[in-house]
């Protein structure tokens, strides 16, 4: 599959855009959509490799982060409403519960408000 640039929008519960970014579509096997991003990721070190896994029928997505040298860093799991993917744009409503899973399989629950 030729690389396709897409826009991902993380939305608040009221539908307003919290964060938006560009990435490349690397796989689509409904209901799974996989993106890769190599850009500036906010507080994440520039050059970090981010693989993003979204299922159009599930209430979560998973980011797999690698250091710039390719070493696995961690998984980051977002609890969200099932996303939509239409015309090169993926939108999901973030439900503000996140889980970080480290290489030793320990984890930390974040954003419980």
Residue ranges of model-derived segments:
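Charge-rich, low-complexity N-terminal segments
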Residues: 1-49
